[in-house]
């Protein structure tokens, strides 16, 4: 099944009776791997790719590992709107132009996976197959961020994460062997783990 979805006056016309405001986002964003080959389609990798995260949106900062000279940043797959989790394996795709600024941050702890920074949150991206591995990876990255990068006591990090760090499904493209014909049966996933910036002040 295919359907053309009109976008009119900053609204997405989902059905004859339902229109919603546009919420633009970038589905694919990543850098090049140090070895081997990568794909901006699927799955996602530690250096990014087709993560389909709604937080990769205007005003946010995406932090990516850099493994090669020049980074070779790739951006695409623009969406007019997408629900978190992308349950049908497709968003409301749209043509457009992404205006971004790029900074190289040196002399920091290496990133194990992408992170997204908003005005209010640090968002840690978990990648893995099965999905439990994705969740574990996201938790471990957040824990390292608090303990290694910010000098927290380990016990304090556990307590704050248990109380305030929310987790959710990001997109279904974390599988190492995705089945496009059965998107709702994805065996791996991208997960996101949210830490309020207020805990760092």
Please provide the spans of the model-predicted regions:
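Short, Lys/Arg- and Gly-enriched loop/turn segments at beta-strand edges
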Residues: 70-80, 170-173
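Intrinsically disordered, low-complexity linker/loop segments enriched in Gly/Pro
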Residues: 1-57
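TerminUS-proximal long segments
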Residues: 147, 156-201
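A hydrophobic, small-residue-rich beta->alpha segment in the mid-to-C-terminal subdomain
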Residues: 110-162
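Short, compositionally biased
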Residues: 75-92
């Amino acid at each position: 099944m295919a359907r053309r979805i009109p976008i009119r006056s900053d609204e997405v016309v989902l059905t004859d009776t339902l229109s919603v405001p546009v919420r633009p986002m970038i589905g694919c964003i990543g850098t090049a791997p140090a070895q081997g080959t990568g794909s901006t389609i699927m799955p996602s990798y530690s250096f990014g790719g087709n993560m389909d995260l709604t937080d990769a949106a205007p005003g946010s900062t995406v932090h990516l590992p850099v493994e090669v000279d020049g980074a070779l940043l790739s951006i695409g797959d623009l969406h007019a709107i997408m629900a978190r989790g992308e349950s049908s394996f497709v968003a409301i795709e749209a043509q457009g132009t992404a205006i971004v600024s790029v900074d190289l941050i040196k002399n920091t702890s290496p990133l194990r996976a992408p992170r997204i920074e908003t005005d209010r949150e640090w968002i840690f991206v978990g990648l893995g197959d099965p999905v439990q591995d994705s969740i574990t990876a996201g938790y471990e990255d957040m824990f390292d961020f608090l303990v290694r990068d910010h000098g927290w006591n380990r016990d304090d990090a556990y307590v704050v994460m248990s109380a305030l760090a929310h987790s959710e499904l990001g997109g279904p493209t974390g599988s190492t062997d995705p089945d496009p014909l059965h998107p709702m049966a994805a065996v791996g996933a991208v997960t996101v783990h949210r830490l309020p910036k207020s805990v760092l002040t």
